């Protein structure tokens, strides 16, 4: 593995992209352990800054990300996970976390009701 440059708190930003459509699905953070777990298992793992723990995408929702390839940027301080997305990527129920324009117009497709999956609304 290349020598990654982790930012403050030992985290690196991860952009998640659909490996077929190239659609950007989400952005999250990973620590070194989460990156290694992702690399070794082929399932996307991230680090939750609010819960202060590693989490596997889909462990609660069933909407998993199978990682086909991990790309590293030129400065070695940002990653792209190219994934096969099962269901929605966003905890709000949308396929992608980027489902709104800057002026607030919803352009994305809602896949599930977060209240039914998590017992709470997405926001």
UniProtKB/Swiss-Prot annotation:
Which Pfam family is one of this chain's hits?
PRA-CH
Q: What is this protein called?
A: Phosphoribosyl-AMP cyclohydrolase
Q: What is the E.C. number?
A: 3.5.4.19
PANTHER family per record: HISTIDINE BIOSYNTHESIS BIFUNCTIONAL PROTEIN, HISTIDINE BIOSYNTHESIS BIFUNCTIONAL PROTEIN HIS7
Binding-site residues for Zn(2+), renumbered to this chain:
74, 90, 97
Cofactor annotation = Mg(2+); Zn(2+)
Assembly and oligomerization: Homodimer.
Judging by the UniProt lineage, the source's domain of life is Archaea
